[in-house]
């Protein structure tokens, strides 16, 4: 068993920083040299944060090793990693002269099991054959979302990309997209799920709710239900919501064998990934 704390100081959100390189100095204001009216000029690039600290990860590991008659040996480990003071780019009002500032905020947990097995299938003077197998299963969950720079409260959700949205208790790799409902037999276009907000009497409050988490945030004090409407081929009217699919595989690992015949040896290694979903941008 072991316990420890590791740090991370890398803030590498290139798209948000607009630098095209890693943010090596997130604690200080940065400027770039540009041509302005044919004159070399220093131009403000991004805002730093002098109070920024290391991102911290607490690691807990518990494992067991075993050997069965020298034929099968292996190891099983349980790990639990809680990351706090996460490095995050908090959006700010553009009137301040910059769009975001790096801060320490949010918590995330990764917990799971890793194993490795080796079977000594053949073991003689001239021939030996070892078969190897290892794997890992883990669950990623968001413990605490960052603060909202405008309201001063914890975020209800955070849209990480156009396909992934973060909520407390969910994974950073949970798909948040419109639900596919088949093909329109008349046009051949793909159909997607729509949602309408209705009150207790069945009156429609809003047709075509396109972002479920955003609607929940903006209508917390209201009583309503989201009712499925007629499928649409218009992507702009489709309802984006969690579809119960994750990009995280259920099990990943590798396998292979080591063969020796006198002075000749052969080793192979293969990798595998079971479960998890991928989004096809070409056919979507």
Where are the regions a protein language model picked out?
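Extracellular/periplasmic, surface-exposed regions of secreted and cell-surface proteins
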Residues: 1-167
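Conserved small-residue
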Residues: 13-16, 20, 103, 122-245
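Flexible, active-site-adjacent loop/turn segments at secondary-structure boundaries
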Residues: 50, 84-86, 103, 181, ...
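Extracytoplasmic gating/loop element in the C-terminal half of outer-membrane beta-barrel translocons
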Residues: 273-284
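Conserved C-terminal beta-signal and adjacent last beta-strands/turns
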Residues: 128-130, 246-274
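Flexible glycine/proline-enriched surface loops and loop-helix/loop-strand junctions
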Residues: 44-45, 238, 249-250
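Short, surface-exposed charged micro-motifs
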Residues: 63, 180, 256
């Amino acid at each position: 068993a072991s316990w420890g704390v590791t740090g991370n100081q890398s803030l590498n959100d290139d798209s948000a920083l607009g630098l095209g390189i890693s943010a090596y100095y997130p604690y200080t204001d940065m400027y770039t040299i540009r041509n302005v009216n044919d004159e070399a000029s220093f131009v403000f690039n991004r805002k730093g944060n002098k109070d920024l600290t290391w991102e911290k990860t607490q690691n807990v590991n518990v494992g067991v090793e075993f050997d069965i008659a020298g034929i099968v040996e292996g190891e099983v480990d349980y790990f639990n990693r809680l990351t706090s003071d996460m490095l995050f780019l908090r959006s700010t009002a553009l009137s301040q002269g910059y769009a975001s500032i790096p801060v320490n905020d949010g918590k995330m947990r990764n917990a799971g099991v890793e194993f490795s097995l080796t079977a000594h299938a053949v073991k003689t003077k001239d021939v030996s054959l070892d078969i190897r197998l290892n794997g890992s299963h883990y669950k990623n969950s968001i413990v605490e979302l960052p603060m909202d720079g405008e309201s001063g409260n914890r975020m209800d959700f955070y849209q990480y990309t156009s396909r992934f949205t973060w909520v407390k208790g969910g994974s950073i790799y949970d798909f948040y997209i419109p639900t596919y409902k088949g093909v329109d037999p008349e046009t051949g276009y793909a159909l997607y799920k729509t949602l309408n907000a209705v009150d207790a009497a069945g009156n429609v409050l809003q047709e075509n709710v396109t972002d479920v988490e955003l609607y929940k945030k903006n209508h917390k004090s209201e009583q309503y239900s989201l009712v499925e409407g007629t499928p649409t081929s218009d992507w702009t009217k489709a309802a984006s919501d969690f579809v119960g699919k994750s990009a995280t595989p259920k099990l990943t690992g590798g396998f292979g064998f080591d063969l020796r015949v006198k002075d000749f040896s052969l080793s192979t290694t293969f990798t595998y990934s079971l479960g998890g979903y991928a989004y096809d941008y070409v056919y979507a």
